[in-house]
Amino acid sequence: MSNPLDRLERKLGYTFKDQDLMVLALTHRSYAGRNNERLEFLGDAILNFVIGEALFHHFPQAREGQLSRLRARLVKGETLALLARGFEVGDYLRLGSGELKSGGFRRESILADAMEALIGAIYLDTGMDSARERIIAWLGPQLRELTPVDTNKDPKTRLQEFLQSRGCDLPRYEVVDIQGEPHCRTFFVDCEVALLSDKTHGHGGSRRIAEQVAAAAALVALGVENGHD
C-alpha cells in the first residue's frame, strides 16, 4: 500500500530518511500533540541565510539595504504560500477540527509556515547542503528574475513587504498633528510597528510624505536599512 506522503515528496523533489520529520512539519499547532512551530522557527532562519547568501553572490554590487529588500521579497509569506500551493501542501496538513472547517489548509500564513517547517525538517534530516539545494531549486526562478532595480520602492512599500515576510501585522499610521496655514501645512505622523516597542515619527508637507518619512525611520529602527541606501 503506497504512502500518501510519497507523492508530496516527489513534488518537493526530496525523499526524507526520517518521514516522521515530514509529518511533524505538516502538523499545525491546532492539531493535538506536537506541532511544527519549532521546525518553522528553524526553517525561517535557514531560509533567510540561504537566500541572503545567494543574493550576496548574485548581486556583488548591491548595497546592504538593497540586498535586505530583495531578500524580503523572496522570503515573504505570499511567495512561500504560492510554493506550497504549487506542491499542494495543503492537502497533507494536519489541522485541528476548527482550522479544518474554516479552511486553514488554504490560509496563506499556515501554508507559508508549513514551507518553513519543511525546510527545517530537511535540514535536520540530511543537513544544510540538502536544505540549500531545495531552497535554491524552489526559489531559483524568482531569484533569477530579480534585479537591484526592484528595490527602488518607496519606504512604505518596503516596510510592508518586510513585515509581511515576517508574518507581522501591517504598520499603522496616525496623523498626530497638523501645523501651519492651509496653504503651507506640515503634517506630523506616527508609525506603529509590532516589532518595535516605540513608534517612529515623520513630518512633511503632506500626509503621504510624512508617512513615507515615518516608514523610513521604522526600517532603520528595525535594522533593515541604515538610512544611507
From Swiss-Prot:
Keyword entries, A-Z: Cytoplasm, Endonuclease, Hydrolase, Magnesium, Metal-binding, mRNA processing, Nuclease, RNA-binding, rRNA processing, rRNA-binding, tRNA processing
Residue positions binding Mg(2+): E40, D113, E116
Record Pfam families: dsrm, Ribonucleas_3_3
Domain RNase III: 5-127
Catalytic site: D44, E116
A Gene Ontology molecular function term of the record: rRNA binding
Job of this protein: Digests double-stranded RNA. Involved in the processing of primary rRNA transcript to yield the immediate precursors to the large and small rRNAs (23S and 16S). Processes some mRNAs, and tRNAs when they are encoded in the rRNA operon. Processes pre-crRNA and tracrRNA of type II CRISPR loci if present in the organism.
Subunit record text: Homodimer.
Protein name according to UniProt: Ribonuclease 3
Organism whose genome encodes this protein: Pseudomonas paraeruginosa (strain DSM 24068 / PA7)
Organism taxonomic ancestry: Bacteria, Pseudomonadati, Pseudomonadota, Gammaproteobacteria, Pseudomonadales
Primary gene name: rnc
